[in-house]
Amino acid sequence: MTTPRAQEATAASAYPRRFRRAEERGRRIGRILRRVAGVRHVDEELLDRIGRRMYARDEPGAALVRAMRRDGRPGAERVTMAQFERALREGVQAVPDAPPELVRFFSLVDAVPAWVDFDLVERGAGVIRRLGRTASDVLLQLSLIGGYRFGGPAELLVATGGLSGATAMRRLGETETWSNAVARPGGLRRDGEGFRLTVHVRVMHALVNDRFEHNGRWDVHEWGLPVNQSDLAGTLGLFNSTLLLGARALGWWVSAADARAVMHLWKYVGLLLGVDEDWLFDTEREQNVFNYHVLLAQDGQTPAGADLTEAILKGQRRLSEARSNRLRAAYARARLLGMLRCFLGRQSLEELRIPVTLPWAVPPVLVRNLAASLLLGRTEHGRQLLERAGERFRDRRGALLFAGARPRVGPLPL
């Protein structure tokens, strides 16, 4: 079902105005990615699909949300939050007289495709757990802040109230809580926290999309749908192949078999999130080719991205100063700014209003990661040590991001 505003926008143009508006900038940012992925020619058909799917949503999620809205729907058809939460915890069969849309939605997310190999999922989860702080570094600096370089998703984050330092850090904590749950042993089994939080995030996306499609605060002609298939698939790419690319850039050795396992884990997560199945990839190369074309499809830098970056950096500084002496806090900031310089480059830092510094704190990180992955990572005992170290780091980080409260993902904004 397409809303009148989305129909009107699609009738006016096959693509929103932001599509390919800063293509040369995308080429510059994606130079290394293009070489890594072996892209020789731009796939115009793929770019066309990316542009068109800026007007496409997660339809099963949207149908569930329509049934959750208080719009005079008969009681037997309307889905309550209590019914959704019980179905998520216990299965839809545990909901008495479950409404049809609730049954349809959970029949999709509960169905495990034949291609899902849970042994491979568990191997991928172990790789992510061993990455520990390196995974957090990459997801914050390359995936999150790197994603603020483009208009569209950044505007939605600002519109939903992400500009205060406290809110920015809470959202970062919620994202890390979810990604950590996905990587726990058994996390993506039906009774795992990673499964439950992923489905929760999917419905949260659908609720936000529904709200901003209808409240008159979102320019569909400019940006496409608030939460659309192209942005969803692009975001998924920040958690799989971008994580691997960034970890290697920081000195972490990842074998081809381990990389395939990480890709497989996130392929299943993408399915649960409602990403179109033809954009769920098995290999790094396929994902990197897609990611490169996503870069070409993007808009340029907008004020929203720089404002979000400022909020994150202020929040990170407050965390460092609260838990460390002045010298350690200064090192933490130098480490963060140095990695951002390496990942994003001077020009992107200037566009995001990030101080440009010499990355002197990065070489020790490279040495440490090389030693950890090449020495400890080669034995079972060493891998167990890395997993435990990663778990301790995640516990400390969660306590900081949530100021001592229990880490969690935000409630559904019904």
Please give the residue ranges for each predicted region.
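Mature, function-bearing regions of proteins
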Residues: M1-L236, N240-L414
